[in-house]
Amino acid sequence: MDEILKIDTIDRYNKLFGFETRHPLVGVVRFDTAESQGNYRMTMGFYSVFLKETRGCRINYGKTGYDFDDQTVVSIAPGQTVGYTDIEGIPTKSVGLLFHPDFIRGTSLGRKIRKYTFFSYEANEALHLSEEERTIVLDCLKKIEMELRHAIDKHSKGLIATNIELLLDYCMRFYERQFVTREDLNLDALARFERLLDDYLSEGVAAREGLPSVRYFADKICLSPNYFGDLVKKETG
């Protein structure tokens, strides 16, 4: 698995795993029907959102690897390198949404895609769903899949883009819930940040190096810059 595959199109991704391509720029894939589930490392040229329903594979991206629990959502931005490794003896049951940046260009979703900062979270910052949340995510995916099976007409793109946007809005809501339910961990991270900031200022580093970046502190407490920034905004208002 040393070679990194460059997967620029959804059609090429589908061919790798044996999925049917219903639309060149959007796809909903179900890994329990995949013809191939080997071990891969790849850089994808499109957005992807995966709902893991079993612990049947390991996913590595960013700086960390993670054996995802059931009912976990992983969101990956274009250009990230992702590794898939099957876990022997455990069947993979997961469903994924793939959509190319070209598809959302000129849409409401295209104009707001950057607000979905969870696309740049680390693997261990994935979204863990309740049963009710899982049902909502699956319902959104089913609606997108239904549109992909429908004959293309003048409404197709708008309906698909709207349902993708709805799914991402739900993910944002669920992440905000996760920040609340993990408050103890979040407060610990913020306390470490405050100590690091005090040290940075008291030891004269600021005078030499200038004001630190979000990435500087995020790296120190082992969080992605986007997750750390969202955490600070959530806790401080």
Give the residues covered by each predicted segment.
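A hydrophobic/aromatic-rich effector-binding and dimerization subdomain
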Residues: 87-152
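Conserved metal-binding segment of the jelly-roll/cupin
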Residues: 68-82, 98-101
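An amphipathic alpha-helical interaction segment
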Residues: 135-198
